[in-house]
């Protein structure tokens, strides 16, 4: 800890995995006043939302058990970052002054307007509110009513598995492939588990229309669906673009390799909403923690007048649960490409559960107790050298103008 007379005001926007960890880690200095802005009064374990929807687990934690001493929690939503006046405008009408902002607003996942009927009839599971709506819809639905899950990624797989294990009649529409980021052997394991447990897996297949009681496939086929769950694709909030900050095509804040905005060195990004060098890391709970830590370290370095370090993160693989009694841990190279090795079955389920607990207990809570203590695997590939804001802005390619 260091002692100073002047407090540096840091506003962290978003209380997910990246933002909450960043808020805790900022306390390596005792001259930093940290305000965490989040639209909900509780922390949401996003990687457990499929359990919450299926009533096989909870997905919220009281912030009082997660935040370090002295952090102010403001339950509100940011509507604009005014870099000229260094203020964050909130939905309530309140304005927060800042010296630095950590932009950790996360990602979203709503049914796309481009698919007829999806917005009106499909339900997402990407956020707590949508998962709660899904839970209520499931409660009102007969057990044998057909449920369609759209999306063959990890969220879709976990949702389908959780529901079929509860006795639901589930169809999984996979798009081009099931678990496309996994190895061939890992994909076969998942496909076999789903088939044995009664999930009807359609691949390759795509949904071209969602109706109140059915889905229409791209090949013209119609499948009955009393409830359609949309898990395909993610987006991000438009706060950065609405604030006149440059973003990539998806809306993620463009930064250099220290996670500093290409437009303003007092705005630092973390988690799913960051696009360092126009080459963002995989949107994931795995990357969120290290990115939150690096964002906090960048702010601390700027306060101290030292050069911030660049991103250094190696991936090790990914986990997916298959109900409560099975799962798979897919191993990967440092660059996040899968190798032909996985751990399945009950051991895979145990690894997934330990991973979920680790993110909260050994990362977020440990940073609350001992700021600066978190470490993570390093050595993954990134653009060579320190990429400056100007270089990032000129080479990003897909940039949305302010």
Where would I find each of the regions flagged by the language model?
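FAD-binding core/adjacent interface of flavoenzyme oxidoreductases
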Residues: 1-7, 71-146, 229
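Beta1-alpha1 glycine-rich phosphate/pyrophosphate-binding loop at the start
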Residues: 2-72, 158-184, 402
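Conserved N-terminal Rossmann-fold NAD(P)-binding element of oxidoreductases
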Residues: 12-14, 103, 150-151
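Glycine-rich, N-terminal phosphate-binding loop of Rossmann-like dinucleotide-binding domains
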Residues: 15, 105-106, 112, 219, ...
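A Rossmann-like FAD-binding core segment of flavoenzymes
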Residues: 72-81, 85-88, 96, 166-257, ...
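FAD-site-proximal beta/loop scaffold in flavoenzymes
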Residues: 118-143, 222-290
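A conserved FAD-binding loop/helix module that cradles the flavin
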Residues: 241, 249, 273-323
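C-terminal auxiliary extensions adjacent to catalytic cores
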Residues: 324-402
């Amino acid at each position: 800890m260091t002692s100073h007379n002047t407090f540096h005001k840091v506003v962290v926007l978003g209380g997910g995995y990246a933002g909450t960890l960043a808020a805790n880690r900022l306390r390596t200095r005792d001259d930093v006043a940290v305000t965490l802005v989040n639209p909900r009064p509780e922390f949401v374990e996003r990687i457990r939302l499929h359990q919450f929807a299926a009533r096989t687990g909870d997905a919220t934690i009281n912030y009082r058990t997660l935040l370090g001493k002295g952090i102010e929690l403001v339950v509100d939503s940011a509507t604009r970052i005014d870099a000229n006046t260094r203020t964050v405008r909130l939905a309530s009408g309140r304005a927060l002054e800042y010296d630095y902002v950590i932009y950790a607003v996360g990602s979203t996942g709503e049914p796309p307007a481009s698919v007829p009927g999806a917005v009106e009839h499909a339900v997402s599971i990407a956020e707590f509110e949508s998962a709660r709506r899904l839970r209520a819809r499931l409660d009102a639905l007969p057990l044998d009513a057909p449920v369609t899950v759209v999306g063959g990624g990890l969220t879709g797989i976990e949702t389908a598995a959780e529901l079929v294990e509860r006795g639901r009649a589930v169809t999984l529409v996979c798009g081009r492939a099931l678990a496309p980021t996994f190895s061939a052997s890992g994909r076969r394991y998942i496909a076999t588990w789903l088939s044995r447990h009664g999930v009807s897996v359609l691949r390759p297949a795509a949904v071209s229309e969602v109706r109140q009681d059915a889905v229409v496939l791209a090949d013209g086929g119609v499948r009955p669906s009393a409830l359609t769950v949309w898990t395909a694709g993610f987006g991000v909030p438009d706060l950065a673009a609405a604030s006149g900050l440059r973003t990539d095509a998806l809306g993620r804040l463009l930064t250099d390799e220290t996670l500093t905005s290409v437009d303003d060195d007092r705005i630092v990004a973390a988690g799913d909403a960051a696009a360092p060098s126009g080459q963002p890391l995989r949107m994931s709970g795995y990357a969120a923690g290290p990115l939150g830590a690096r964002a906090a370290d960048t702010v601390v370095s700027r306060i101290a007048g030292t050069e911030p370090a660049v991103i250094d993160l190696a991936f090790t693989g990914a986990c997916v649960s298959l109900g409560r009694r099975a799962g798979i841990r897919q191993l990967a190279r440092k660059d996040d490409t899968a190798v032909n090795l996985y751990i399945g079955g009950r051991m895979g389920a145990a690894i997934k559960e330990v991973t979920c607990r680790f993110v909260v207990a050994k990362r977020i809570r440990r940073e609350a107790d001992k700021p600066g203590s978190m470490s993570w695997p390093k050595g993954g590939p990134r653009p060579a050298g320190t990429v400056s804001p100007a270089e990032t802005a000129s080479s990003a390619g897909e940039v949305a103008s302010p």
